[in-house]
């Protein structure tokens, strides 16, 4: 997978070098390019924002900066072609198309010459809620681009125009407002990259995660068996795999009912699941 991130704070994406994502980079499973939006400015102050039309507080990020930036990242041209990746691979440039010469990027179909448009993800509190299903779907993408907004956001025309070169999704990681999109990018990038085969040492690790079956994951324990007067449940030492699986399912159901009962409406429940839930007193 190729990830490109456009931001005015490239250093904010430093965590992408570390832990499992860093390992994926080392193994060649993932390559990452972090692009400074100011590379596409034309004034001495490297301005990326202006006052909002119609008045109001804050500043809006300028289309004449964002447009060329996204054009170049999609095509692997301009400043995007010279950025230093977080690793040495340049595999993402093999199937990218040259820029047009008139300053306007050429619209492409969903596929052009057998090449699928990159996926552009725009973090915004006005977007669709980010879910595990999205992470699963995105984990199969070849090229994902994140556009990190700041201030009052990016001029909406940038998003509309980007459909000519990208498949675009506006996504929110929660019902709250952050200073910029960088934190959301770190969240979403980790959520999807960990699902790529070979990134996790044990593939079963994510198959048993919270939300994989629509439920919250139950509690986890390790040794010692007793700690500060608290015991690991006996069933986990029983050696009876069927009973352990049943206990884990019931713990997952109980936690979901207590913390996120809304999730139960979209989960396929067995008769045994329903009977267990009906008997719970929370």
Curated annotation (Swiss-Prot):
Organism annotation: Corynebacterium jeikeium (strain K411)
Function of the protein: Specifically methylates guanosine-37 in various tRNAs.
GO cellular component: cytosol
Gene Ontology terms for molecular function: tRNA (guanine(37)-N1)-methyltransferase activity
Catalytic activity: guanosine(37) in tRNA + S-adenosyl-L-methionine = N(1)-methylguanosine(37) in tRNA + S-adenosyl-L-homocysteine + H(+)
Annotated GO biological process: tRNA N1-guanine methylation
Pfam families in UniProt: tRNA_m1G_MT
Name assigned to this protein: tRNA (guanine-N(1)-)-methyltransferase
HAMAP family (UniProt xref): TrmD (MF_00605)
Predominant localisation class: cytoplasm
Major enzyme class: transferase
Entry binding sites for S-adenosyl-L-methionine: 149, 173-178
Subcellular location: Cytoplasm
Similarity-based family: Belongs to the RNA methyltransferase TrmD family.
Keywords: Cytoplasm, Methyltransferase, S-adenosyl-L-methionine, Transferase, tRNA processing
Subunit structure: Homodimer.
């Amino acid at each position: 997978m190729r990830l490109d991130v456009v931001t005015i704070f490239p250093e904010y994406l430093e965590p992408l070098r570390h832990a499992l994502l860093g390992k994926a980079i080392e193994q060649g499973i993932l390559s990452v390019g972090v692009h400074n939006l100011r590379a596409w400015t034309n004034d001495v102050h490297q301005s990326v924002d202006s006052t909002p039309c119609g008045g109001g507080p804050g500043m809006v990020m300028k289309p004449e900066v964002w447009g060329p930036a996204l054009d170049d990242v999609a095509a692997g041209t301009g400043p995007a072609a010279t950025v230093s990746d977080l690793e040495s691979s340049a595999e993402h440039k093999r199937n990218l198309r040259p820029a047009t010469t008139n300053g306007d990027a050429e619209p492409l179909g969903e596929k052009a010459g057998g090449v699928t448009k990159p996926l552009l993800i725009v973090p915004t509190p006005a977007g669709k809620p980010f879910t595990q299903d999205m992470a699963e779907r995105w984990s199969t993408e070849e090229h994902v681009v994140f556009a990190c907004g700041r201030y009052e956001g990016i001029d909406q025309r940038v998003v509309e125009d980007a459909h000519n070169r990208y498949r675009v999704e506006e996504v929110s990681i929660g019902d709250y407002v952050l200073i910029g999109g960088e934190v959301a990018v770190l969240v979403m990038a980790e959520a999807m990259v960990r699902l790529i085969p070979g990134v996790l040492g044990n593939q079963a690790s994510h198959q048993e995660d919270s939300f994989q079956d629509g439920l919250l994951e139950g509690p986890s324990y390790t040794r010692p068996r007793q700690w500060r007067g608290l015991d690991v449940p006996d069933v986990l030492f029983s050696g009876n795999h069927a009973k352990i699986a049943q206990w884990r399912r019931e713990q997952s159901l109980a936690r979901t009912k207590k913390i996120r009962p809304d999730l139960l409406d979209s989960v396929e429940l067995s008769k045994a699941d329903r009977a267990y839930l009906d008997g719970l007193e929370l």
